[in-house]
Amino acid sequence: MGNWLLPESLADVLPAEARRIEELRRELLDLYRTYGFELVAPPLVEYIDSLLSGTGTDLNLRTCKLVDQLSGRTLGVRADMTPQVTRIDAHLLNRAGVTRLCYCGTVLHARPADLLSSRELLQIGAEIYGHAGFEADLEILSLVLDTVAAAGLRQPRLDLCHPGVVRAILDADPAAAAYAEDIVLLLREKDVPGLAELARRDGGIRADTAAALQRLPGLYGGPDVLQQARHDLPLLPGVAAALDALQAIIDAMPDVTLGVDLADIGGYGYHSGVTFALYAEGWHDALVSGGRYDDVSRAFGRARPATGFSLDLRKLARGLPPAGRARAVRAPWGQDAALAAAVRQLRRAGEIVVQALPGHQQSQDEFICDRELVLQDGAWTLRTL
């Protein structure tokens, strides 16, 4: 095996794609700033107990671990930047009011999410801390839509969920709550026969609980699903509150294509309120995901309501049309002071100037040189090619 081969599910990013990704990164961070979000940059590696504080087992399984040669303690390479940003808000900034933070950085997964996914992601996202009302959720959803619009996506679909529905059903039946992890997995896979078999095998799960859990995978579709859920599910306060929270979001966004999937409870042990996933044509799974996670900052000694979202910029860029080649100016290489001044002036004006080194022809695929610097009547001037 060649020494140049990369590990499985990792890849180099070549110039055209790297340029597209960097352009997106700059544009999106500038967009987030217009909303009042402040940029933070947590470290790539942290002590594992800090990195996983307040998160579920899913993040633990996705985290690559190593031993710190200075302290002997276990380190983790971040698989998600959100807990780090939560730590910054709760422990370092320690502000009393609303805080808006955004971020962009590399994350590494121990295993790919699926056969088509990479283990290395360039995660970008935004979080609002300090406001428990649905106004913060609406601002995050508006920013999500502006994010994909800035990338050129049209007519995306937002699917909403709320883990409070499942949580209320399980809390009302201790026998079912004992199998919470199994039930969550079966719901995410929409495995109705598996849910029925679990209830039959245990015997202690109440019939109404089993029926409600088996009904959940079928409760997906348009906003009218909420009305069906009120009819099909137990009249528990927690269920009603979760459905009301979803309805409030739907009522506030009449011009957005919204769906509801009450079994899409990824991050069940992490999220506390309305969650969402954004889908768009050209991507095989969710492009953006996020939601409310009010309990995570408690692990850092300061409970703060929180909601936010994140996406993988590499994944976003791969689904976009190929970027056009940038236009550039071709110039000779030389030590002439007037030539150097002309090149410097063009670059300061934002032009790309590629100087051909001696003995080489222009061969870069990244640029189209449609003009060149030529010496004419003793002065360096631009000529159209």
From Swiss-Prot:
Primary site of residence: cytoplasm
Record's subcellular location: Cytoplasm
UniProt key word Ribosomal protein: no
Any single Gene Ontology cellular-component annotation: cytoplasm
Family annotation (Gene3D superfamilies): Bira Bifunctional Protein, Domain 2
The keyword Cytoplasm appears for this protein: yes
Keywords, comma-separated and alphabetical: Amino-acid biosynthesis, Cytoplasm, Histidine biosynthesis
One Pfam family this sequence matches: tRNA-synt_His
More about this protein: This function is generally fulfilled by the C-terminal part of HisG, which is missing in some bacteria such as this one.
Role played: Required for the first step of histidine biosynthesis. May allow the feedback regulation of ATP phosphoribosyltransferase activity by histidine.
Protein name: ATP phosphoribosyltransferase regulatory subunit
Gene (UniProt): hisZ
